[in-house]
Amino acid sequence: MHDILDLDRYPLDQPGSEGYATLVERCRRALDTDGLFNLDGLVRESVLDGIVAEVAPYLRDYAFTHSRRHNIYFLPEVDGLPRSHPALTEFDTVNHTVCADQIPESMVCRIYEWPPLAAFLADVMEKPVLYTMADPLARANVMAYHDGEALNWHFDRSEFTTTLLLQAPDAGGDFQYRQGLRSDSDPNYDGVANLLEGRDRAVTTLPLAPGTLNVFKGKNTAHRVTPVEGDRDRIIAVFSYYEDAGVMFSEAER
């Protein structure tokens, strides 16, 4: 894995070492403060073109085009909110997805399945263990966003999301988030409305370079990817890890 990942800078394969402990502590602090952490340049720049070249034919010829109009909650309605409430404003999300079962021998899947990565994430999250997902489709996806396409405002349903940016677009495709917009006890619908209507000045734009692993707690932090601009796609891998072994999605969840 040393030929793919910069394990000199990020010693994920050396648990118990001082460098590993320092990295885990740094990532924990970032999660507590910012709700996310990045391992910038985890994937070596020298192999990024090769990774993209592996998945590009599948994205071109076999990707599933996911096009959906949705609100920030991914729900048809929210108890106590009229349909006209601005917190239920709808947006379009479009991307093109290749699933792990289509690229089982790819470097993307090798990275996802590499045991030290899941062990490192578990240490940062202070969990006993994290497992790769058993679902052959949902465990790891590669998504492409073409010119004009975006992942619009939403809250995540899972505790955390792990992504690996493989290719940045010519312009646009920026990751934006609004930390602490709601809590488990306060949905803050008026605050959500302010965000969606463009009045929230606390939105953060996070520049991500190809090769960056990003771990993000998005359950109560609204986030989006702005529309891509230009002929160069935004290509990103999404990795799913769980505290329970053998997790599968239902047909409806897929």
Q: Where in this protein do the model-derived segments appear?
A:
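Catalytic core of non-heme Fe(II) oxygenases with the double-stranded beta-helix
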Residues: 101-109, 116-213
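Short beta-strand His + acidic residue motifs that chelate non-heme Fe in jelly-roll/DSBH
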Residues: 151, 222-229
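Signature of the catalytic double-stranded beta-helix
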Residues: 43-44, 50-54, 58, 82-135
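Cytochrome P450 catalytic domain signature, combining two hallmark sequence patches
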Residues: 56-67
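Conserved "cap/hinge" positions at secondary-structure junctions
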Residues: 41, 218-219
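A short hydrophobic beta-strand segment most commonly corresponding to one strand
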Residues: 161-164, 215, 231-246
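Fe(II)/2-oxoglutarate
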Residues: 1-33
